[in-house]
């Protein structure tokens, strides 16, 4: 076998930016490996900030920025970060990104920033963020790491937004602050807002219903007893 033939055989086709493997990094967290309903991470935010859709959307976009940015930075630095201080480096990177998010919210969305309160700062300790940095970004190239961050952020986001839609609609009769039930005249017919939907336990129950529906549809997610 000639040297040229051997070199040709050793060459592998270049993987596309959105190859099947890379697409799975986006699609899997939306369902089969959802960070909230399957891995049971980030539950605190689902309980605390899903009273209104606006808060859920802003928190979701904040996590998207932090996770994608953190994954990218850690992946770029993965070969130069000493193993013994990797957690510290990850925390510094995430903290810097969270500070940026917090300042932007204070400048452009002060009302939402006040409502979210300390929960934006607590993104630093979000298990989804630290888990993806440690489990994926440290061992993979920048592009897959960015896709992983995007996929897990979207998996986190759709759960928060769905929970917020149910809680705000049935608890306040609004969606994203716009009155929905009042123009329909339902209050005149005797309908009353369900104030229980505003309470944190209802967020947990709503997440539980989503988990039940998800596992009823996808039986492979059911844990073996």
Regions found by a protein language model. Give the residues of each.
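Transmembrane alpha-helix boundary signature
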Residues: 100-115
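Cytoplasmic-side transmembrane-helix entry/capping segments in multi-pass membrane proteins
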Residues: 81-94, 115-121, 148
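Structural signature of hydrophobic alpha-helical transmembrane segments
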Residues: 53-69, 89, 113-124
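Hydrophobic core segments of alpha-helical transmembrane domains in multi-pass membrane transport
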Residues: 42-47, 63-64, 68, 95-102, ...
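Short, membrane-exposed interhelical loops at transmembrane-helix boundaries
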Residues: 176-196
């Amino acid at each position: 076998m000639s040297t040229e033939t051997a070199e040709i055989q050793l060459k592998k086709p270049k993987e596309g930016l959105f190859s099947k493997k890379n697409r799975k990094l986006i699609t899997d967290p939306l369902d089969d490996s959802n960070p909230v309903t399957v891995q049971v991470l980030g539950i605190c935010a689902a309980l605390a900030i899903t009273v209104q859709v606006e808060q859920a959307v802003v928190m979701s976009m904040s996590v998207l920025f932090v996770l994608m940015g953190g994954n990218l930075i850690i992946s770029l630095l993965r070969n130069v970060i000493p193993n013994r201080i990797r957690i510290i480096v990850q925390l510094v990177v995430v903290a810097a990104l969270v500070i940026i998010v917090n300042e932007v919210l204070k400048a452009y969305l002060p009302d939402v920033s006040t409502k979210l309160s300390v929960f934006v700062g607590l993104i630093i300790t979000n298990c989804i963020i630290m888990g993806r940095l440690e489990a994926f970004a440290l061992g993979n190239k920048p592009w897959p790491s960015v896709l992983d961050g995007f996929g897990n952020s979207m998996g986190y986001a759709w759960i928060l937004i769905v929970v917020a839609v149910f809680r705000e609609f049935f608890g306040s009769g609004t969606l994203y602050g716009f009155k929905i039930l009042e123009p329909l005249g339902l209050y005149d017919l005797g309908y009353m807002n369900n104030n229980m939907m505003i309470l944190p336990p209802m967020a947990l129950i709503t997440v539980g219903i989503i988990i039940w529906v998800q596992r009823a549809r996808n039986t492979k997610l059911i844990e073996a007893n």
